[in-house]
Each structure stands twice: as C-alpha cells, then as structure tokens.
C-alpha cells in the first residue's frame, strides 16, 4: 500500500511530513513514525477551525498530492479594534492502567498447569530450554541446576525433586502483574497562555504553551514547548498582510525498536526484540518475575540471549530532541 497520508494545509500554506509513510508503516510502531508528523509542533489552543476536504474540489485546488484528502487548519488571529486580552488555560489528565480482567489471558496457575503437561510429554528438555531461542521458567530451572554459586561452591539449585518442586511452585503462584510493573499513573499536563488584541492598523495574537506527558509507561515520556506570534497589518482598506512566526521544542523518550517485517508464509508481522510495554504485558507469561528474591533482576531467554524487560528499558531506548522554527507571510488584496 502506498502513501495514504492526507495533505496538511495550515493558514493557506502546505505542510509536508518529514517522512512519507505507507499505511503499514504508520501502524508499524517503527522509530520513523515518531518524527514524521508535519503538525506535531502545533498547539491545539491556537486552532480556530479544521476542515476535511475529500471530494474532487480538493484535488482541483491542491493537485495530485490531495488524492488522500486535505485537512485545512485555520489558526487564531487577533481582532481589530479590540482591547488587550490575556488568558490562561490548563488541562490535567490521568490514564488508568490496563487490567488483566479486560483480557482473556491465563494466570500463572493456569499457565503452569499447561507447562507441566507439556513437560511430561518432553517439550521442555534441557537442551532446548538452555540453548533454544526462547525459554522461560525452565531455562531458569536448568540454569540454576547447572550453575555453581561462587559464594557457596554449590549449585544454585540442588538437583532434588523437592528443590525442583519448590522452584516451580514459586513460579506457579507468582502471578506477575506486568501491567502494574510497566504502566504508571503519571499525569498529562497542558498549559497555555494567550494574548490577543488589536488597534486600527494592526492586530496581534500570541501564545506560549507547555505540554508534558510524564509517561503512561515507564519507558516513555514527552515534553513540548510551543510559541506562536501572528501579526496582521491593515495597510489599506483593500490590502492586508499577515506575518506568523512559530517555534516548538520537543523532547521525547521511547523504548528502542527494530523495524517491523512481514512474514509472508505465516501472514503476520514480526519484530525482533519487541519491547513495546503493552505488547510485552499482553504476551509475557505471568509465571515469570521481574526480580529475584534478593531484588536483583531475573533473566530468562529471548532471542538466544538473557533477557529482562527492565534491563532493556535502561539500555535500549530512543531519546529524541526536535527544534522546529517557521516563518510564514501572507498578503490579501480585495478587489
């Protein structure tokens, strides 16, 4: 599927996306989607009107680029012969954590019952568990059975039926709530100050805004500062000139990601080392634990390597900093 992005028109000027993406790419979660938006620096407080053009009139005005539709945004302007007005607005939002009750997923006891049946049929042998591409509690079991603790000179786990049973019982009742570990109740705050007014020959609209999302998950956060000044000059009864200056600074943190690829044989999309918090919480067994009893990180096997999601978030991340500055002029002459 080719490019399906609409054409953005803000105050008469066409805004191009930094990166043109297909529909599959837009939904991919790839890193490029975080820098592709043409309007990411536009403060919603500054928007006066939004129109969506989807018919033939869109292409007649804007050409072939408008085949996917046109979104026309008009920003606020100061009004002529009005007193100076200063306003402040704020918005604060808290998002709830996802819950396992909203999904039909196995708890740790149900998962362990399935694991034990598979183990009885020979699916969790020592070779596959220790050296396979992915392995969970049985990787940990065989690793502890075969690794000597340097502090004691003995194996981490004695090779006895009682020790094995105790190890598996701990995992059976772990019932790890990955949503609780990976998601937060941190707020989203949005502040905006606007100034508007005008005299006989000019009008001004100005705004500054600060947006801060402390992160719905432990792996992401974003903050943005915007500034906008729009001056309108009434040079004569027929001629009007407008000068708009916009600036925004964005700082963002996100979990690292590998490009998504399609498996045509299975008809599914795949991604190596996918650490998206929501996908991870949904797809990870609740028999696994994030920490050992001593508070250290507990690792299992993923893509042939020891893996812990918190270690990944500490070391596999994206820090994005963007500065955008725009100056736009417009002249209108009435016949």
Model-derived features with residue positions:
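N-terminal periplasmic accessory domains that precede
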Residues: 9-11, 60, 66-90, 170, ...
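Extracytoplasmic
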Residues: 3-5, 45-47, 66-70, 83-85, ...
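Outer-membrane beta-barrel channels and translocator barrels
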Residues: 44, 188, 199-200, 234-236, ...
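Surface-exposed loop/interface segments of Gram-negative outer-membrane beta-barrel transport/assembly proteins
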Residues: 5, 80-175, 185, 215-220, ...
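Short acidic/polar hinge/loop motifs at secondary-structure boundaries
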Residues: 13-54
């Amino acid at each position: 599927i080719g490019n399906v992005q609409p054409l953005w028109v803000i105050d008469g000027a066409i805004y191009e996306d930094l990166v043109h993406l297909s529909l599959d790419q837009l939904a991919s979660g790839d890193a490029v989607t975080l820098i592709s938006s043409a309007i990411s620096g536009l403060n919603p407080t500054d928007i006066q009107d939004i129109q969506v053009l989807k018919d033939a009139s869109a292409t007649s005005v804007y050409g072939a680029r408008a085949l996917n539709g046109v979104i026309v945004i008009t920003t606020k302007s100061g009004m002529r012969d009005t007193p100076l007005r200063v306003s402040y607005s704020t918005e604060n939002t808290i998002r709830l954590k996802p819950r396992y009750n909203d999904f039909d997923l196995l708890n740790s006891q149900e998962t362990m019952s399935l694991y034990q049946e598979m183990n009885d049929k020979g699916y969790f042998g020592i070779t596959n568990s220790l050296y396979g591409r992915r392995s969970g509690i049985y990787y940990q079991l065989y690793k502890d059975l075969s690794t000597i603790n340097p502090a004691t000179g003995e194996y981490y786990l004695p090779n006895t039926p009682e020790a094995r049973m105790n190890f598996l019982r701990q995992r059976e009742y772990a019932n790890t709530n990955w949503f609780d570990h990976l998601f937060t109740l941190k707020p989203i705050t949005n502040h905006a100050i606007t100034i508007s007014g005008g005299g006989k020959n000019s009008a001004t609209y100005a705004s500054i805004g600060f947006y801060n999302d402390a992160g719905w998950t432990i792996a992401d956060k974003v903050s943005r500062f915007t500034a906008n000044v729009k001056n309108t000059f009434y040079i004569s009864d027929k001629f009007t000139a407008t000068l708009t200056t916009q600036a925004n600074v964005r700082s963002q943190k996100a979990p690292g990601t590998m490009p998504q690829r399609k498996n045509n044989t299975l008809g599914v999309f795949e991604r190596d080392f996918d650490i998206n918090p929501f996908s991870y919480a949904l797809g990870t067994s609740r028999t696994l634990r994030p920490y050992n009893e001593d508070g250290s990180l507990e690792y299992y096997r993923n893509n042939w390597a020891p893996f812990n999601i918190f270690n990944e978030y500490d070391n596999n991340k994206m820090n994005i900093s963007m500065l955008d500055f725009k100056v736009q002029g417009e002249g209108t002459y009435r016949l």
